[in-house]
Amino acid sequence: MSEVGASAGTSEVLVSFRGVQKSYDGENLIVKDLNLDIRKGEFLTLLGPSGSGKTTSLMMLAGFETPTAGEILLAGRSINNVPPHKRDIGMVFQNYALFPHMTVAENLAFPLSVRGLNRTDISERVKRVLSMVQLDAFAQRYPAQLSGGQQQRVALARALVFEPQLVLMDEPLGALDKQLREHMQMEIKHLHQRLG
């Protein structure tokens, strides 16, 4: 990936990649000199061929990979050395990464309990986010008892339940059929409009 300009707008910059590079072997750069500003409330899609560094860039932003060079800022603060669970970033993976041994409600409660919220707050947030993704009736089901679209909505709800300042999605619709993919694109668009 190469230099990308920031979109026009007056809102504040939420994410900034400054000269970010990533190499796994010390020789070949997967991400080369990425400079990108993402503004608060902006919906941004990274496009490129396989192997161009899209997922690697998301993983560095989320904290699952470390840049070889450069700096990543979140709300004006360097996060290069901040662990993933302290970045206030929700992430939806392509394979959804739901815990198969936990119910939907337990999957949603997990990021809240890790953050030390009390049971009452956890219960309220889980109910609210289940309603948001229209899965109220599925709270006690396990991921294997859900359709692909329902699993995708649970993964999205889990990324939103702790009210992060940023949500990242790595090909979240890739495993869905065309009709469901188009439906979920609209769902994500509506959620973005509501939540910013």
What are these model-derived regions, one by one?
Residues 3-180, 184, 190-191:
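ABC family nucleotide-binding domain
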Residues 196:
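Conserved H-loop
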